[in-house]
C-alpha cells in the first residue's frame, strides 16, 4: 500500500474546511490544486507559483474596475468621490490596504516560511468567520509591520 502524501492530506483538509464553510472560492481553488498535483499538470507548479499571484491580482482588479468600465458607476460618481468625506476616507483606506498588500507580496516572496501560517489563518478566517480569501496579502502586510520586513 502506498504511503499517503502529507501535502495531499493537508490540501484535502483545507478543501474540507472550504466545504464546511460554504466557501466555493476556497473549495474550488484547493480542488484545482489537488487535480494539478495528482495529474501530469503538476509540472506547471513552478509556473503557477511564479505567475499565479500576479494573474489573480489582475483578475481581481478587472472585477473591481468593471463597474466603472461598464458605466454602472458614472464618471460623475467617480469625481464626487473626491468631495464626500466617506468617499475620501474610503480612498485613504484603499491606499493603506493597497500599501499593506504590496508589503505582503514582498514578505511572502522574500520569506516563504510565513506563507503556510498565513494561508492556514486565512482559510480558518474564511471557514469560521465568513471572511474572504484575500486575507493572505493583507495579513502578510500587517505581519511585515510587526516583524519589520518589507
From Swiss-Prot:
The chain crosses the membrane at residues 1-21, 51-71, 88-108, 114-134. It holds the Pfam family DUF441. It is a multi-pass membrane protein. Its main location: membrane. One of its GO terms (cellular component) is plasma membrane. Keywords: Cell membrane, Membrane, Transmembrane, Transmembrane helix. Belongs to the UPF0756 family. This is UPF0756 membrane protein YE1142. It comes from Yersinia enterocolitica serotype O:8 / biotype 1B (strain NCTC 13174 / 8081).
